[in-house]
Amino acid sequence: MPRVKIDSNKCTGCRSCEAICSLEHFQVVNPLKSRIRIYHEPGQRLYIPIISGPFTGAQCTNKTVKVIGGVEIDGCVLCPVASCPSRHLFVEPGSEIPLKCDMCGEPPDPMCVKSCASGALTLVEVEKYATDFERSY
Amino acid sequence: MNGWMGKIIRINLSEGRHFLESLDPLMARNFIGGRGLASKILFDEIDPAVDPISPENKLIFATGPLTGAGAAASRFMVVTKGYLTGAIACSNSGGNFGPELKFAGYDLIIFEGKAKEPVYLLIEDDHIEIRPASFLWGKVIPETVGLIKQELKESLGKTDWEAREFRVACIGPAGENLSRIAAVVTDDERHAARSGVGAVMGSKNLKAVVVKGSQSINIDKHDQLKNTLFLLWEKLKEAKSTGYNLPTYGTSAGVSFYNECGIMPTHNFKYGVFDHAAKINGEEMKKKIVKGSFGCFSCPIRCGKITEVKEEGKVWKGMGPEYETLALMGASCEVDDLAAIAKANYLCDEFGVDTISAGGTIACAMELSERDYLPEEDIGFKLTFGDGEALVKLVEMICKNEGFGKVLAEGGYRLAEKYGHPEFFMGVKKQEFPGYDPRGVKGMGVAYATSNRGACHLRGLTSLSELVGIPEKVDPLTCEGKALLAINFQNFASVIDSSGMCIFAFRGIWQDGTMEALLNAVTGVGFDSAEMLKAGERIWNLERLFNLKAGLTKKTDTLPKRLLEEPSPRGPAKGHVVELDKMLIEYYELRGWDQDGVPTEEKISELGL
């Protein structure tokens, strides 16, 4: 199945993906309505794209800390789940409806991948659902 | 409204109150937004003869209709009467601040008066608050941003992620000290640096503007916008400059190119060729200091270069240096030590100083010192061209407002004047030149001389046509047709700035209808090419009228004697001077101005001013 592969080393934090995702799905530009967000670590100049997965109503207990590029990052931030009680993210402002990536395009040709000039986002074919450990940071 | 958010915040700092106003659609159409709209408001509301750092001057943060709308457009403009130039100032910065201001629901913020104590402005959608900023006063930019984020988390109960999403535009110690070359810096990423806008912000006791929003930018025809964006991305990717040079090397790619063209300002604009350019060019930078790239909001060009310089016991991190910095702090000071230039650049970024003006001023000081017009004891040490250590030291003195740095912080014009040799100041309207020697690219000569905010590379970048060939290649060494070329570039640049687009996207949108298509898709107003360029001309004339009322005259439309009388000694421009008078007469005529450079009554009424 087609999946979006994230290579955060290539991400330049331009947020074209955020703009085009909201434009595609809501016909407006608003990063808070986007199903992809760029996490950034200001002093470190580290940019990590996060794509929203399914909504979950419960918070998990195995909190982790990941080290990327020498910077400790809360595992919750990188979780591929959409929104959960510990992370108010990927929720449409106003309506509070959770947002989930729908692999837009027919056949899947996601807008975020199209808009990514740096090559951080690419469309790949995987055999099974890509889980956390298959993403490369 | 589509594209525009339709709301303006007016902050009266003296009274500590704010008012909301709505944007007049007709005015938005006539002046597009950003630079145009803010200039119009400034022109209508202040006396152009006002002292730039008095409470009567106003400071406007303005976005355009395309800012944040997804089209390589992230710019916001800081418009005020410039403290360096005394002319209208419009400094322009990318990054994420401009789009965030739109997401908060506002097109413009107008600051009036002066706060009694240091304050910062917090905007979160409808919540607008003026907060005390004494704890930020005197702090450098990264520290200021850090402390604001910390306060957001600790006092206002924001989560880590939320605090991260707040964007900050602030001044550093240079702005607080009212340095005439102080900048407004957004998040430690991008700078609106020219014309001393940071000092105006400092004079109002305004340390920072912090903004976050959740509103949407409405798009009139989203399908058309998407299709235009696909085309634009394709075009930007195909062009060598925006598809390869800028993403790979950043603007430093220009060093080798402009040096070969013979327009690299060297030895305070004495020569047009820098022999050691290979030590500070794009390839060298990539090899030695570049660690990664940064892109402003929704920009596929991502020309920002994240760099790092290691020295014993300390690692310097930051962005840049950009081409202009390399040209002014490097070639013009004849410094070929990349690490020294980078360090000087980081210092400027941290303290909020314009690198172009700082470089130009130091080059001027070096020349004065070598000619024995500037006594060694005034500086405190012997200053010669090519001294990288002295460059870093002087920049540090400017940043910290210490010793001779106090004189340098006033800019090159005042420095040269103070020591009795104004002819060694390289700039126009008291503002230092950017990195193009106009003797080798004549159009830039007339563009510099007539630029409304003083010497500037963004107002009429005719070198794009003369050297790069966009939209078509013309001979850089002749004066024929250059006045018209400068006018066309100036008008179009006014449109680009006012819309919120970045001038680097120029390569993909120049004269092929893309700009109109973007504006129309986003705003739905129905601009045609003629109306759009008319708006550009209107903005240019308005700025000119402001300057004339501010006391600038035809006499300030000139270049330093060196460029007018001293033929370029070597390189492709050897033997050339700028024949300005000829071009200027033609320029005034084509602009519809009288021979004193004043727009005629017919022109003013034609433009509806």
Describe the role of every protein-language-model region.
Chain B
Residues 1-92, 96-609:
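Intrinsically disordered, low-complexity segments enriched in small residues
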